[in-house]
Amino acid sequence: MLTIKDVHALEVMDSRGNPTIQASVILSDNTKASAIVPSGASTGKREALELRDNDKTRFLGKGVLRACENVNSVIKHHLIGLEATSQAFVDERLRALDGTPNYANLGANAVLGVSMALARASAKALNLPLYRYLGGANALTLPVPMLNIINGGTHANNSIDFQEYMIMPLGFESFREALRASAEVYHTLKKLLDGKNQLTSVGDEGGFAPNFNNNVEPLEAISQAIEKAGYKLGEEIALALDVASSELVDGNFNYHLKGENKILDSHELVAYYKELVAKYPIVSIEDGLSEDDWEGWAFLSKELGRQIQLVGDDLFVTNASILQKGIEKNVANAILIKPNQIGTISETLETIRLAKHHAYQCVMSHRSGESEDSFIADFAVALNTGEIKTGSTARSERIAKYNRLLEIEHELKGGIYIGKELFKHG
């Protein structure tokens, strides 16, 4: 029987130059594996707690030495000797050890790092790819990437309100071809922006951060780039938005669109989305309304839920009980999956199973503060999520996930790129 021999953590850096945790697990056969925990910029207030030191003399208060110490002392002491391949049991032990609903004691960053490292070590010890260990024989589907090629909101210092403008390469036979087309669109967009004397500096997730005058201009620019790159807009490559509207809302559920110089209520914002969807081939909108605007979400879902994908990120925070509330209220039809919002691999799996049972689409997702760790690429294939959000075709912490998916597609040989089939349900 494989057991846990040692657990330890180290403070390392993420892609924004902020500290994060690298957790390592060593098994009884001396197999060792590590995992680096990501961190978000726009975070839902119901997310599990990311434990920071708040010591202003180190990293402006963002150090994670306390979380590392929790791994190196408390967590280590309680996990040594446990069966390594009993992921659910170990994750439950971590949850009980913390004793709070949101990991306020140990820190979700401490707990998730250990949970990820354990899964990776167990897969390695059994000589299995991580996607096969987590997903079994049914792990066969390569996800459609949602590539963030123009950044706004909290991910960039510009005048665009919406946080992410994405492309989805649906009309291709393989992940490799879909990624190639996306990269070509990205480079074509750069040339177009250069030609308009727009900034081509990039945001946290590798997308460009130009100073457009309003929120529609990025849609025009991306549409142009797709067609100029030689692809059919809407058929081969569609558009998607992450509005991150919890960053735009005030206490009265009015949404401040500075790029448009408008203040809209929920119904007016939904009407605005309907105009955009009618004019552009937008197939997905994430966080179209605030995480607390349940009434607005119900209206959005009624108005657009049969037409496009409506993704809850801040709304659901990868939490099964909150998702259940959304299901009961007929809110949204898809959920963003971010393991660090909930705390462990097993809790993430629970949320995905609930979503799939109720025909909600699942989108595996990175965070804006990332690393070279490619865990979510394997996780997306393991759970056949069908979609993955992991940034643009720039910045090595984003490319690490895409390169891992290329490896997986090559290994699977008979793997399926879901492509056009993604939105053919209901």
Swiss-Prot record:
Catalytic activity: (2R)-2-phosphoglycerate = phosphoenolpyruvate + H2O
CDD domains cross-referenced by the UniProt entry: enolase (cd03313)
EC number: 4.2.1.11
Domain of life: Bacteria
Annotated metabolic or biological route of this protein: Carbohydrate degradation; glycolysis; pyruvate from D-glyceraldehyde 3-phosphate: step 4/5
Keywords: Cytoplasm, Glycolysis, Lyase, Magnesium, Metal-binding, Secreted
Record-linked PROSITE patterns: ENOLASE
Cofactor info, note text: Binds a second Mg(2+) ion via substrate during catalysis.
Cofactor: Mg(2+)
GO molecular function: magnesium ion binding; phosphopyruvate hydratase activity
UniProt-listed GO biological process terms: glycolytic process
Family: Belongs to the enolase family.
Its job: Catalyzes the reversible conversion of 2-phosphoglycerate (2-PG) into phosphoenolpyruvate (PEP). It is essential for the degradation of carbohydrates via glycolysis.
Protein name: Enolase
Organism: Helicobacter pylori (strain P12)
